[in-house]
C-alpha cells in the first residue's frame, strides 16, 4: 500500500525540486542528466494527466474538508464563521469558473517574478472546491453521532483534539463513507473540465484528435473508449467504498 503511494508521490516531489530549486537546474545544465528533455506540464496530457489530477486532488481535499468540518462546529465564533464562509463560497461557485479564475485571473494578482505552474494552480483550485463538499459530508457524520459520545470522551479526561481524533472522527467517518465516495466519484468525472484552461486530459485529447483530418469519422469510438475508462475507474472506487462499508458495517 505504502509503496504504491510512494510510486505516485515521488515523481511529483521530484518535479517540484527540479522546477524550483537552482541546484537541480544546474545539475541538468551540467549534462548529468544528458539525453532527458524537460517536458513542461502544458505538454502533459491523456489518461496520465487524469490520474495525476484526480490523485492529488483526492489526497488534498480530504484533510482540508475535515478541518473545515470541525471548524464549522467549533465553539469559537471566528473559526466557525471563517469555516462557514469558506464552505459556502466554494459551494456557490461553478467549478468551470474556479478553473478559469485559477488559470487566467489569479496570475494577474501575483508579483511579476513569482510564478505558479498552471497545473499546480488547477490542482489547488479543484482541491479547495471539492474540500467544501467533503466538509459538509463529514459534518453530517459529526451531527449524526449522539451527544453521549462527546460526553463519554470528556468524562475520560480527553481534550478536544484527543476526543475528536480517537473517538468522534473514526465513528463519523464510518457513517459517511458513501457520501465521501460519491464526492470523490464526482471529482474524477469533473477532471475533463480542465480542457477549458488548455490542459488536455483524456477527453481533451479526444477533442483535439477529432479535428485531425486523419481521424475524421472516428470520434464516436474515442468517446466510447473514454466512457469505458471512466466507468472502470468509478466502478472500482464504488466497489472499494462498498467493501469499506461492509468491513465497518456502517449500516448497523
Cite the ranges covered by each PLM segment.
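Transmembrane alpha-helices and adjacent helix-loop boundaries
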Residues: 1-252
Amino acid at each position: 500500500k505504502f509503496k504504491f503511494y510512494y510510486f505516485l508521490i515521488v515523481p511529483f516531489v521530484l518535479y517540484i525540486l527540479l522546477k524550483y530549486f537552482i541546484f537541480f537546474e544546474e545539475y541538468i545544465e551540467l549534462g548529468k542528466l544528458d539525453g532527458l528533455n524537460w517536458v513542461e506540464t502544458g505538454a502533459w496530457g491523456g489518461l496520465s494527466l487524469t490520474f495525476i489530477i484526480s490523485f492529488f486532488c483526492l489526497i488534498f481535499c480530504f484533510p482540508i474538508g475535515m478541518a473545515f468540518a470541525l471548524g464549522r462546529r467549533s465553539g469559537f465564533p471566528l473559526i466557525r464563521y471563517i469555516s462557514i464562509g469558506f464552505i459556502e463560497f466554494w459551494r456557490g461557485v461553478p467549478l468551470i469558473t474556479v478553473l478559469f479564475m485559477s488559470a487566467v485571473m489569479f496570475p494577474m494578482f501575483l508579483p511579476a517574478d513569482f510564478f505558479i505552474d498552471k497545473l499546480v494552480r488547477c490542482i489547488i483550485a479543484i482541491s479547495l472546491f471539492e474540500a467544501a463538499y467533503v466538509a459538509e459530508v463529514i459534518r453530517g457524520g459529526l451531527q449524526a453521532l449522539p451527544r453521549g459520545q462527546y460526553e463519554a470522551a470528556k468524562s475520560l479526561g480527553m481534550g478536544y483534539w484527543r476526543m475528536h481524533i480517537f473517538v468522534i472522527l473514526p465513528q463519523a467517518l464510518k457513517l459517511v463513507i458513501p457520501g465521501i465516495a460519491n464526492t470523490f466519484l464526482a471529482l474524477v468525472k469533473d477532471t475533463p473540465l480542465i480542457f477549458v484552461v488548455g490542459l488536455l486530459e483524456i477527453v481533451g485529447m479526444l477533442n483535439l484528435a477529432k479535428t485531425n483530418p486523419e481521424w475524421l469519422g472516428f470520434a464516436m469510438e474515442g468517446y466510447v473508449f473514454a466512457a469505458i475508462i471512466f466507468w472502470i475507474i468509478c466502478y472500482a472506487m464504488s466497489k472499494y467504498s462498498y467493501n469499506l462499508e461492509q468491513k465497518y458495517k456502517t449500516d448497523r
